[in-house]
Design a protein with these regions (language model features):
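Catalytic alpha/beta core domains of metabolic enzymes, predominantly
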Residues: 130-131, 139-286
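Hydrophobic or amphipathic alpha-helical targeting/insertion segments
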Residues: 86-127
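Active-site mouth loops of central-metabolism enzymes
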Residues: 19-37, 56, 75-83, 139-152, ...
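Alpha-helix-loop-beta-strand connector modules within alpha/beta enzyme cores
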Residues: 60-81, 114-126, 186-197, 281-283
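Glycine-enriched alpha-helix->loop->beta-strand junction motifs that scaffold or abut catalytic
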Residues: 72-75, 93-99, 120-123, 190-196, ...
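N-terminal amphipathic alpha-helix/helix-capping segment at the start of soluble metabolic enzymes
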Residues: 1-27, 120, 283
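Hydrophobic faces of well-ordered beta-strands that scaffold small-molecule active sites
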Residues: 22-28, 53-55, 77-81, 99-101, ...
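Glycine-rich, proline-tolerant flexible connector loops at the mouths of alpha/beta enzymes
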Residues: 29, 35, 46-69, 100-108, ...
Length: 349
């Protein structure tokens, strides 16, 4: 699909924009004062495939976390700053790779100037973060609620604060807890500027509902070519955010080094425990980086017939499964040996 044309913003070693792969982000959730826990979580996120990590900096004491993580983990860091412009300056001076602020609530004009100049000197981009829970009072009064138009007006106002200072090294995130509002706001904003967009649904919910809402909003926008970096926000282990984001990109054909895993919902023709077989196989294959399609099908109707385009798959029979490749039968395998058989055949591809 054709992506919306944007300029490039460099965040540490990761380039964000339409000329580059979509970057996956997450956020540390350990207490800022627990440096070891944050380092451990940052390492785990990088191993899971996270490209950029955001961390909250609620106090001056917490600024030390930036250098501690950068010494231990080679990954771009984004400082999440609220209200106190001095924290943004301190984070930039500490070597953070991007600063997330709302220029409209960071302080006076002089304080905004100080943040912008510090970021300009160090070539650090600013991420303007607008969400439905923190709109300016005057905008809420104008629209009555956080509509898509209200969110975009807020974002454009923040942009003006930066561009009036001739600062264009920024990107924008516009998020709502409502999936439709998120889609409408980003679609509207994308028509107005060429700056890169960070996509996400704020307060999306637990792993189950959060993934559904995020997939609807983020996936819908990506299908329209909108979006340059994403976060699947979840009330869950941040590792799940990263895995879900990569699975979403793979499902849309935007990542070519991941297994595309498909399985049928089963029916009365199925004579094997396909639920267990599919879960076990998916988990075992999730870390393999190969551009192939693997199908776990319940009977001969769905596979290898309907799944003939799969590079590899199994179709359930009477207490056993037929392993096939590109629609051609290979051999039969017992249910408890399906995962191992798939792993062995994948190694041959």
């Amino acid at each position: 699909m054709q992506r919306r044309n944007t300029r490039t913003v460099q965040v540490g070693s990761i380039a964000i924009g339409s000329a580059h792969p979509i970057a996956v982000q997450s956020m540390l959730c350990a207490a800022p004062g627990d440096i070891n826990a944050n380092i451990e979580q940052a390492r785990a996120l990088k191993t899971a495939g996270c490209d950029i990590i955001r961390l909250a900096i609620p106090s001056m004491e917490d600024v030390r976390l930036i250098s501690a993580i950068k010494e231990a983990v080679d990954i771009p860091l984004v400082a999440d700053i609220q209200f106190d412009y001095r924290l943004a300056i301190a984070a930039a001076q500490a070597g953070v790779d991007k600063v997330r602020i709302n220029p409209g609530n960071i302080g006076s004009a002089d304080q905004v100037n100080a943040v912008v100049e510090t970021c300009r000197e160090r070539e650090i981009p600013i991420r303007i973060g607008v969400n439905s829970g923190s709109l300016e009072k005057e905008i809420l009064q104008k629209y009555g609620r956080p509509t898509a138009e209200a969110l975009v007006e807020s974002a454009m106002g923040h942009i003006r604060l930066l561009e009036e200072r001739h600062f264009t090294n920024y990107l924008v995130a516009i998020k709502s807890s409502d999936a439709i509002t998120t889609v409408e706001a980003n679609r509207l904003f994308a028509q107005k500027t060429d700056c890169p967009l960070h996509l996400g649904v704020t307060e999306a919910g637990t792993a189950h509902m959060g993934i559904i809402k995020s997939s609807a909003a983020i996936g819908g926008l990506l299908c329209e070519g909108i979006g340059d970096t994403i976060r699947v926000s979840l009330t869950a282990d941040p590792i799940q955010e990263v895995l879900a984001a990569h699975d979403l990109l793979a499902a849309l054909g935007m990542e070519s080094d991941r297994i595309r895993f498909v399985s049928c919902p089963t029916c009365g023709r199925c004579r094997v425990d396909l639920f267990r077989i599919a879960e076990e196989a998916e988990q075992a294959l999730s870390g393999i980086h190969k551009n192939i399609k693997v199908a776990i099908m319940g009977c001969a109707v769905n596979g290898p017939g309907e799944a003939a385009d799969a590079d590899l798959g199994v179709a359930g029979g009477n207490g056993e499964l037929l392993l096939f490749a590109k629609g051609k039968p290979l051999y039969k395998v017992a249910p408890e040996k399906v995962t191992q058989a798939l792993l062995e055949e994948i190694d041959k591809l």
